Amino acid sequence: MIRAHVAGVLALVTPLAAAPTSMPVYSSALDGAEQPPLTGHPDSRWVVVDFDGLPQDNDRLAGWSANITGLVYVRHFGQTFAEVGWAQEKTRSALLDVRPVIAGRSVQPLRMYSAQRPSPDRDEPTPLFAAVDVYQLFTAPAVGA
């Protein structure tokens, strides 16, 4: 069930990795999936999608409310302010006010929970800018499910 939530959201942003956008999309949401190195990355811009508020240690909702509210963190990275802004524009058009498809669940459109302007990461030796958009995901059992 939780994998379906993660997969439903990722299905909205993974097409950004294909042409013409060609922006790599990474996630460490389940099973310790790989994240990109933050230094020396071969691509000039990329995004990392993570989740919070979902029980991610297994597939079941046992012990959790049938109504799920989670947060989707989309971290944008680029070598310039403009690249990060471009990445935010692309991911926002893919996620904002869109309903992920999750089998057996009634899903509300994704809402912007908070947003951050691109800013330089001063801890990195190479130029790196970053910004985080946070979306709220709310699902409930589908009627008749």
Question: Which stretches of residues belong to each language-model region?
Answer:
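Small/polar-rich, solvent-exposed N-terminal microdomains that initiate assembly or binding
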Residues: 1-62
